[in-house]
Each structure stands twice: as C-alpha cells, then as structure tokens.
Amino acid sequence: MPGLKAAEIDGRLEAAGIEMVYVVCVNDGAVMTAWKKDQGLAASDLIEFVADTDSDLTDALGLQLTGDGKPYGKSTGPNNALGYNSRRCKRTCMYVDHGVVKVMQVAEALDDPAGDDRPELACI
C-alpha cells in the first residue's frame, strides 16, 4: 500500500491514465473501511477499498485460495489455519479497461499459494 499511496500523491497513477484503483478483499465493509484509513488513504478519491463479503467476485474470477484441492480452510494442515469455511482470495493485480480484463497477474507458487512471499509478482 505505501507504494500505491506514493504513486497517487506524486501523480504517477493519473499520468498513466488510471482513473480508479480498487483494493478488493474477501472481508466485510467495516474492515475494508478501517484498512483504508489505516493505510492513510481515507481521503483518497482514486483508491477505493471494496469488500467481497461473500467472495462472489473472487469465485467468479477463479481466484479462491485453495490448498490440497479443497477450498482454503476445509483441509488439514497449514491451509486450515484460517478456520473452517474461511474464504480468501489469491494476491492478484488486474488492469481492467472498460470492463475487460487486459492484464491479470497472480502471485502464487506451489510453496506459497497466497502469494505472501512474492507480492511483487502481482504488481503491474
């Protein structure tokens, strides 16, 4: 998030023709509002934090975090860490132009299904 905030402040996003940035997470609206505020982006009109409460968008894009062939949280071992029926989205970055996904990068690997160790792979 710090890089995103800096890019907004110094005008790089606007200069690149980016009209809106959406940070989407499988969570509720209250958490997303608090996260935006925590990141110092509460006043931003360019960067919006959006709750995918029931993971509908995540599922439609095929980005549900899974492990051992099962939805995250429904298997044994490390993928059960978030609890039964937990839904999470893979770390992803997309460039969408007029509703068409032009570029989608997912930061994941067999040893890192969430992309936490390689967040730069989901940067455009």
Regions found by a protein language model. Give the residues of each.
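Chalcogenol-based redox active-site neighborhoods
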Residues: M1-I124
